[in-house]
């Protein structure tokens, strides 16, 4: 078959493009929670410093099942081979799902030309020049069945490739993979039930009174006890082998990295990847005592001071405690270490505990006008069991064979993290101005946050994957805690007068840590660089029930930049740039 010649001298022509790959992914989770609570409240006499006492108990059971398939990428056709003489399945080829039988329906009708007009607002040349490109034209989300049927027909047209277990090696829809649960697109290891049972009890005293110097004191003191039991169901799933056979290795013109291994290692790898599924149910429990004290002192009618002491917990996201292992050896050059294939994969951690924190915060608040205030707050937090990432080399044994893998998972750090800082906030409506300017106001704040991260458990500097640059071993204790910027500033100009409401707000933050581990080689920490965004809104109240307006987001068209941290000197290099565009929304709000 010719290519890009004769009457087919442009990339817009389906003759010059082929169907290369497809991917589907399905999430279908469900859950329910049953809860029972009982509270009692007792109020003291009006002349007592004790205002009220409250106590209660609560029981809850959350039953949740996460169904989360792999990202099912697979080849449809390729330039380097196929079942027929034409190599890949070109976009103008007839397709009937058979590489050896002529005829079928043209796939041109499945394409749609996309010209990439106004690419990056015209500031960057379009990657396609002046030519459009053909792409799959149907709506995949709305017509998944059609997408699946078409992709399967193309893949079978190129060649129905199967391994020694009769499992497809080219792309097939999720539900047609080997080992799925009947009637579903999910394999057993992709279905992760979890039951969490929590028992809690608390007691709290509220108090209020006046000191001899005229200060008015109020607040509360309390204690909560919480115990959680978590039971998870999961599997250690060993992949079915997709390695070349001995015949493939002996007849290959250019042997693959796997075929260059010794025959004994090749045989061991094939035996290891036999599709075994091993049940791996896990349970964990944790309990906490959580005291708290909050005190407010009103020094004058316009000046007050607050102090808070507490211990708090933040449970891990349910996606992090999924119980699954997908163990698969690789066969490419980078997967061969010391003459043996290895693999790299991520897992959940059903034993994760909540992040716990000891918190101190205080503030001074000055209400200098009925619609004006100036506040200064300070805070300190000491965090324990901070979530971080662990990367380790671990051996797995299956079918009498043992191989090494590099696995990553979320863990609770043994190190403590600290957060300290302050915030200054000012807000005021200038109602002393002449009309109509008396509706103008300002809301502004600045916060400073100093945080130290915790080290990420990673491979040693002598590990082969680190030496080869496939895994970073940066000390993440040198970085701030995830998601925290050192400097944060917000400024909003407000107008509220009669039926008109307007707001123009600028929010800015300095750089912050997005993740301690990127999803691709070399798995380095990723920073989000300093960024600011201007938003605005204007609303008009038609009557008590109807309001109309317009909202604008990212009016300055801010570009978000991320960087990767390269070494312990915190040298950074560009990772990605995102242009989110300006967004305008016209709003009609009505109540009936």
Where are the model-predicted features located?
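Short loop/turn motifs that connect adjacent beta-strands in outer-membrane beta-barrel proteins
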Residues: 43-53, 68, 97, 210-219, ...
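Extracellular loop and loop/strand-boundary signature of outer-membrane beta-barrel proteins
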Residues: 22-27, 186-192, 275-281, 346-350, ...
């Amino acid at each position: 078959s010719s290519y890009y010649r004769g009457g087919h001298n442009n990339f817009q022509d389906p003759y010059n493009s082929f169907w290369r790959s497809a991917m589907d992914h399905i999430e279908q989770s469900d859950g329910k929670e049953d809860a029972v609570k009982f509270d009692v409240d007792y109020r003291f006499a009006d002349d007592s410093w004790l205002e009220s006492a409250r106590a209660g108990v609560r029981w809850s059971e959350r039953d949740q099942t996460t169904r989360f398939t792999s990202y099912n990428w697979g080849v449809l056709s390729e330039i380097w081979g196929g079942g027929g003489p034409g190599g890949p399945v070109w976009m103008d080829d007839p397709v009937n799902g058979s590489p050896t039988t002529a005829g079928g329906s043209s796939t041109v009708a499945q394409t749609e030309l996309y010209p990439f007009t106004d690419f990056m607002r015209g500031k960057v040349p379009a990657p396609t020049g002046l030519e459009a490109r053909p792409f799959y034209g149907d709506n995949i989300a709305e017509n998944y069945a059609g997408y699946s049927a078409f992709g399967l027909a193309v893949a079978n047209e190129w060649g129905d490739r199967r391994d020694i277990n009769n499992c497809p090696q080219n792309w097939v829809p999720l539900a047609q993979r080997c080992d799925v649960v009947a009637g579903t697109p999910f394999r057993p290891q992709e279905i992760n039930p979890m039951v969490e049972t929590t028992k809690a009890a608390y007691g709290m005293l509220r108090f209020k009174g006046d000191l001899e110097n005229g200060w008015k004191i109020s607040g509360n003191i309390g204690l909560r006890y919480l115990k959680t039991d978590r039971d998870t169901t999961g599997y250690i799933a060993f992949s079915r082998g997709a390695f070349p056979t001995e015949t493939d290795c002996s007849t290959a013109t250019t042997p693959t990295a796997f075929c260059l291994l010794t025959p004994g290692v090749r045989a061991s790898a094939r035996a290891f990847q036999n599709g075994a599924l091993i049940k791996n149910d896990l349970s964990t429990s944790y309990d906490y005592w959580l005291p708290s004290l909050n005190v407010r002192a009103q020094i004058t009618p316009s000046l007050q001071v607050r102090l808070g002491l507490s211990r708090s917990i933040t449970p891990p996201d349910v996606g992090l405690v999924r119980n699954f292992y997908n163990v698969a050896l690789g066969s490419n050059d980078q997967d061969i270490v010391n003459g043996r294939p290895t693999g790299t994969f991520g897992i959940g951690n059903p034993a994760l505990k909540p992040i716990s924190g000891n918190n101190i915060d205080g503030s001074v608040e000055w209400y200098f006008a009925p619609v004006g205030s100036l506040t200064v707050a300070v805070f300190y937090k000491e965090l324990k069991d901070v979530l971080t990432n662990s990367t380790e080399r671990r051996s797995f044994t299956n079918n009498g064979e043992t191989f090494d893998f590099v696995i990553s998972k979320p863990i609770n750090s043994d190190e403590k993290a600290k957060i300290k800082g302050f915030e200054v906030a000012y807000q005021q409506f200038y109602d002393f101005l002449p009309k109509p300017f008396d509706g103008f106001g300002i809301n502004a704040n600045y916060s400073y946050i100093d945080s130290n991260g915790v080290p990420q458990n990673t491979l040693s500097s002598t590990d082969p994957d680190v030496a080869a640059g496939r895994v970073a071993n940066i000390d993440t204790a040198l970085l701030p805690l995830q998601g925290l910027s050192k400097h944060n500033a917000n400024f909003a100009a407000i107008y509220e007068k009669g039926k008109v409401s307007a707001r123009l707000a600028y929010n800015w933050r300095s750089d912050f840590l997005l993740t301690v581990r990127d999803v691709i080689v070399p798995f380095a920490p990723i920073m989000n660089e300093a960024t600011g965004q201007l938003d605005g809104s204007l609303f008009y109240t038609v009557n008590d029930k109807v309001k109309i307006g317009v909202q604008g987001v990212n009016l300055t068209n801010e570009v978000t930049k991320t960087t990767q941290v390269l070494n312990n000197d915190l040298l950074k290099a560009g990772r990605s740039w995102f242009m989110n565009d300006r967004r305008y929304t016209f709003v009609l709000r009505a109540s009936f």
